[in-house]
Each structure stands twice: as structure tokens, then as C-alpha cells.
Regions:
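Acidic-basic catalytic patches of nuclease active cores, encompassing PD-(D/E)XK
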Residues: 1-25, 79
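Active-site-adjacent loop/helix micro-motif of nuclease/hydrolase catalytic cores
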Residues: 44-58
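Acidic, low-complexity, intrinsically disordered interaction modules
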Residues: 45, 79, 87-103
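Nucleic-acid nuclease catalytic cores
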Residues: 64-87
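Charged phosphate-binding loop/patch that engages nucleotide di/tri-phosphates or the phosphate backbone
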Residues: 100-125
Length: 125
């Protein structure tokens, strides 16, 4: 399966995980089950290192409570996933990058964003 849009990833995850559902539209994460919350990113390019915006990471870790917290990155025909609770904060490299303010709109303003570089040895395929 080729993952071109977030909806492609959602459809696939619903197929392989029994009790997973879409989260509410304005939620800080994309999907949830009784056991976990999931944030999804679809990338158009491959990177040697994947990142998560610090704001997003902090929000997810606060909201997940006792649930699992997963970050799923889709690129082409592969899904990479990170168990964020399995990554010690000391393993995260902080980087400040110029990025679009949001990814939802074209011609978006470029702003500086703090992002964590996720450790490759914690990546699951």
C-alpha cells in the first residue's frame, strides 16, 4: 500500500488494529483506542532522521496519561512508528528549524520551530 495521505494511514491502521478510532477533529492527536493515542505524519520525502515538533511531543506526552503514545510516520509504502513512552527525553536532540507554521495551507508563513530528532534505534518498521 502507498501512503499518500493521512486518510490512507488511518484506513490501514483501522484494518490492523481492532478498536482504533479517529480522534475528534480538533484533537492534538489523530487516532485513539482504549490503550493508546496515535499521531500520524505523512512525509513526501525520505529523511535519514525523523523529527517531531517539540510542542506536539510535549502535548502528546501530557495527554496520553496511562495510555501508550505512538508517533507514526508514513513515507511512500512504509510506516515507521515510535513508542514515545519508550524514548528517554535525554535521547532526544533538540533542533530549531525553519518550517511552515502549519502543513494544512499553501503559501504558509515560515516560522522557527523547536523539534526533537527521534533516535533511529527506536524506530520500528
Amino acid at each position: 500500500m502507498i501512503f499518500k495521505k493521512e486518510s490512507d494511514v488511518r484506513e490501514y491502521l483501522k484494518f490492523i488494529i481492532n478498536d482504533i478510532e479517529d480522534s475528534e477533529e480538533m484533537s492534538h492527536y489523530d487516532m485513539e483506542s482504549i490503550r493508546s493515542i496515535i499521531e500520524i505524519k505523512v512525509r513526501k520525502s525520505y529523511y535519514d532522521k525523523w523529527m517531531i515538533e517539540k510542542y506536539k511531543y510535549d502535548k502528546l506526552m501530557k495527554l496520553c496519561g496511562s495510555k501508550g503514545c505512538y508517533y507514526v510516520v508514513a513515507y511512500d509504502h512504509k510506516l515507521y512508528w515510535y513508542d514515545l513512552k519508550d524514548i528517554d527525553i535525554s535521547e532526544l536532540e533538540l533542533s530549531i528549524m525553519d518550517c511552515p507554521k502549519t502543513t494544512d495551507f499553501k503559501n504558509n508563513k515560515i516560522v522557527k520551530k523547536e523539534s526533537y530528532i527521534l533516535p533511529n534505534h527506536k524506530k520500528n518498521i
